[in-house]
Regions:
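Thiamine diphosphate
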Residues: 1-453, ...
């Protein structure tokens, strides 16, 4: 290396100097520099995404159904609608994108004749379309979402990309998903339907470990709401964060980088419990807690006055927290009522984002480790759970995805979930097989209380 340096008449002090601008090599390098130079590109989309579309319903509805309605509502928004792009690997209608497709059309370089005979679906293909339909290739889905999510950097055109896929098949495209998230792409993917709640279709279509993937993959934020309005808030908030771009953070845990994973369901559930929590907490407080990752759906002291009266009268009423995500909330609420009949106060916590709760917990742990101080309980956990009490976690996913909550709260925990391949049957059949029914939840609560002594 020293000989080469001497041959080209350089020294250690000058070997990285630029060429003489007047020399042939300097002129060539200057031309290439000018050709390749570009102004810094902003990753910010100059639109204000609404905080909600009002697509939630008071009647029983599923999160997949509301997801489709929220996208239709956003497509009507003058500023936001033109930047929305959807894509799916041959499952557009079965993941509830039909309404959006009817409004925006399907992209094709040239107009194509529509051969579709579905009377409720307008499959109009042309250059103005905003939906990209793929064949059955989940790998291509995540590769495309990755490129759409980097369009602001590649072509100076920020977009709001949304993809849908059957939840178990998230794993088919996992390598491309990891690469896209690692590259900093900003997008939303909805895995729907999910879990054994998709009961009739059997184990091949029932996802169990996807929640763990969403929780553990850096740069991807898992969201799993149970109620329509909560989904509306979370989806609009995610799109707003994508439009704004990553913001700097000084905390021990990195800021969300802009990739979001919605785990949804086709199970219609009663929306009344959410509306009751809304009346108890107010819209502003409830929305803040939903976006933070968890809120108290049912407060046992409020819902069961006899328990409060007994507690105030000096009787020690056992207390347990029932934490759950997604479509199992009706069973958890029923278990809380059965526990109340046995004199146990069961507070029901709806966990809308395990990811955000876990990140908050890890942030406090790491700050404690780095400063040699005792970590505190994160605010989001403290607000949703309140004073310490044993916890039962219930999840239509692997039981280990929520099992860490006991450690975070510093209490005994019993975790219920799906730790075996599913079978075909009714939702009730599958919930019984995996201990997700109210009776099993009650027994788990008693076990947790027993562990607490």
């Amino acid at each position: 290396v020293a000989d080469l340096r001497a041959d080209v008449r350089l020294t250690e002090q000058t070997e990285w100097d630029r060429f003489d601008p007047a020399s042939p090599e300097g002129v060539l390098a200057g031309r290439r520099r000018e050709h390749l130079a570009r102004a810094p590109r902003s990753g910010t989309l100059p639109v204000a995404v609404p905080t909600e579309t009002g697509s939630g319903s008071r009647r029983p509805s599923s999160t997949q159904e509301v997801f489709g309605r929220v996208l239709v509502g956003l497509s009507r928004h003058e500023q936001v609608g033109r930047y929305l792009v959807t894509t799916a690997p041959d499952v557009a209608t079965s993941t509830n994108l039909a309404g959006f497709i009817n409004r925006t059309g399907v992209f094709a370089p040239q107009p194509r004749r529509a051969w579709n005979v579905d009377p409720v679906l307008s499959w109009a293909e042309g250059p103005e379309g905003q939906h990209l339909e793929l064949g059955i290739s989940e790998m291509n889905l995540f590769l495309l979402l990755g490129q759409l999510g980097l369009a602001w950097d590649i072509s100076d055109q920020p977009l709001l990309p949304v993809g849908t896929v059957y939840d178990p098949f998230v794993l088919r495209g996992l390598d491309a998903l990891v690469y896209s998230v690692y590259s900093g792409a900003r997008f939303i993917v909805a895995g729907t339907p999910s879990g054994v709640t998709l009961a009739p279709e059997g184990g091949a279509h029932q996802s169990t470990i996807t929640a763990s993937v969403g929780l553990e993959l850096p740069g991807l934020t898992l969201l799993e709401p149970a109620y329509g309005t909560a989904l509306d808030w979370l989806l609009c908030d995610a799109l707003s964060r994508i439009a704004t771009g990553p913001t700097p953070t000084t905390t021990a845990v990195p800021a969300e980088s802009g990739a979001y994973y919605l785990r949804l369901s086709t199970r219609p559930i009663d929306q009344a419990p959410f509306e009751q929590a809304r009346a108890r907490l107010s819209d502003a407080v409830l929305r803040r807690q939903v976006l933070s990752g968890a809120y108290r759906l049912l407060d046992a002291w409020t819902a069961f006055p006899a328990l409060r009266a007994a507690q105030d009268g000096g009787t020690a009423v056992p207390v347990v927290h029932l934490a759950a995500s997604g479509p199992v909330l009706p069973e958890v609420l029923q278990a809380a009522h059965e526990l109340a009949e046995d004199g146990v106060a069961g507070h029901v916590v709806d966990v809308t984002s395990l990811d955000r709760l876990y990140a908050a917990w890890q942030r406090t742990l790491r700050q404690g480790v780095r400063t040699a101080t005792v970590p505190s309980v994160p605010g989001a956990l403290r607000v949703a759970f309140g004073p310490r009490a044993p916890v039962v976690t219930v999840h239509d996913a692997s039981s280990h995805a929520m099992a860490w909550l006991g450690s975070a709260l510093g209490v005994p925990a019993v975790s219920l979930g799906v730790d075996a391949f599913g079978q075909s049957g009714t939702v009730g059949d599958l919930y019984r097989a995996h201990d997700l029914e109210p009776g099993a939840i009650v027994n788990a609560a008693m076990a947790a209380l027993g562990l607490a002594g």
